Amino acid sequence: MNTMALDQLEPNDIFFQKILHYGMRDKTIQDVLLLEKKPATAKGENYLSYLTRFTLGYTCGVSDRPNEKNQKKVHLIMKEEPETSGETLRYIREGKIFHNERYILEEVVPKIEKLVGKKLGPKVYYFSNNPSVIVMEDLMTLGFQNKNRKVGFNEADVSIVLENMADFHAGSIYLEEQNPGCMSEIENGFIGPNLPEGFFTFIASGVKSIGAGVRDWQNGRFVSISDKLGKKSKEIIQELKVIYECDENELRTLNHGDIWMNNVMFKSDKNGKTQESCFVSNSKLI
């Protein structure tokens, strides 16, 4: 398989059966067929990966009726390296972005979920290191949705996200206490010594642009804020390097590191009240 794997495969490729055998631990599954596929995000929203939403149909055995078969469907997300090259692709591979996320989602998050008694992220169905591919459950089919980015989060949404973050942090600390060294696989976070200098420059330029953008708001009311952001743009690179440096003597916790609207999904009741949330991506440790 190459990048954009689903575009290279026939609908009945054996790869789809491998996904379900691994993810469902059910060897009676057969006749697996790709029924539908489409991009999971808008162009430009994920620069470190490419996401595809797809549906598989299959048959499987019935436990108490060995001569019968059930026909079922499963809805999944495939995460792959993006169609890019050069510095970005080198960073993705050298920074072990896919390895870290797969390890967290498959090896760490399920254990934390057992400790805290709630779902925190999607189940992993399959992974490959070469090429870098992660297949996980599609949370939308479980009733989870992203919030409207133009509307944002309300107070109840923020409260639930903060509760999940607290459970995630505390659970990771307790898990490390129970199983010393289990976090050693993922000690390198997103921002670290291997991050290309171009990424730091991109961050600094973004802060500077925001400062310039707010300078003329409301007849100069935010000039002081603009000045602060301009100053911060010159300091932020070194500050980030210090903040993300791992300190063996401090209390260490698994940290999501990329909490924004696309990486949090919510489930609501029939009245639209938020009931629970899940993190879509987990890949950072500080």
Predicted regions and their residues:
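Conserved NTP-binding catalytic cores of kinases and kinase-like/nucleotidyltransferase enzymes
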Residues: 1-132, 267-279
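A generic signature of intrinsically disordered, low-complexity regions enriched in glycine/proline
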Residues: 16-17, 105, 161, 183, ...
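Helix-boundary capping/turn motifs
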Residues: 25-28, 138-139, 286
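ATP-binding pocket architecture of kinase catalytic cores
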Residues: 75-77, 82-97, 108-189
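ATP-dependent phospho-/nucleotidyl transfer catalytic cores
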Residues: 143-256, 265-275
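Hydrophobic HxD+1 residue recognition
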Residues: 259
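Glycine-centered loop/turn positions within well-structured domains
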Residues: 262
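Activation of the activation-loop gatekeeper triad in protein kinase-fold domains
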Residues: 280-285
